Amino acid sequence: MLFNDGTPSLNQPEGAPAGQALGASVVSAYQIDPVARTAREVWRFDHQPELSSEFCSSVYQAGSSYLVNDAMADNAATARIVGLDANRQQVFELSYANPGGGCATSWNAVPVPFEQLQFD
């Protein structure tokens, strides 16, 4: 599973392809055949409407749920955290300002357990 930010590589060995530029970022999971040395995409999550987050983003699996971090969404003006359930359906989205527009506001999202959280 990976977060494909859609940005071609900026630092690859000389002569190596930089990769394809995509119009939007996607999360994809692959089935890998180590003998044939091939990979086949088995599912993907495309945020609707489409988002582009060119750097710093990630996806995290916790059990059968997923946490998607679009760290530089909306032309790097916001960070968006999206929760997906076991059916990979969006169950929540949190959007917050990304002052400065870089990777300092958000990087790798990690689930925080709120089961024992109490407010006084």
Residue ranges and their predicted role:
Residues 1-120:
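Histidine-/acidic-rich catalytic cores in large beta-rich domains
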